[in-house]
Amino acid sequence: PMSDGASMLILMSRKKAIELNINPIAKIINYDDSSVSSELFTSAPSTSIKKLLKRSKTKINSIDLFEINEAFAMVPLLNMDILSIERNKVNINGGAVSLGHPLGCSGARILTTLIHCLHQNNKTNGVASICNGGGGASSIQIAI
């Protein structure tokens, strides 16, 4: 379901965090923006995740948790199948169908959810990915 939402994420360099004595809750390892043909938009996250992990030289089975946005319930299921990701690693607290799909801040919602899930489950690395219209997808790899 669509839901109202507002969010803010603060990004800063390690140097600035040290200067301000701020303890970051996560570190960005890498990111990717990719696209596929618009009729294949539901599979776009898998393309983006593959490119992201290749660039960061990370094996998919070394990622602890994934958040894959689900404007449609089948999106994470399809991408789990394409990437051979275990179900217990994806959207472990539910996805947008159960938590809401906040118009305009879905990326911030899934990234924040991923960070908290990693902390709550004593995990250290994760990937968040989202379809962003017209066949595009964005993914980010983080560590805590």
Give the residues covered by each predicted segment.
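Claisen-condensing/thiolase-fold acyl-transfer catalytic domains that form or cleave C-C bonds
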Residues: 1-144
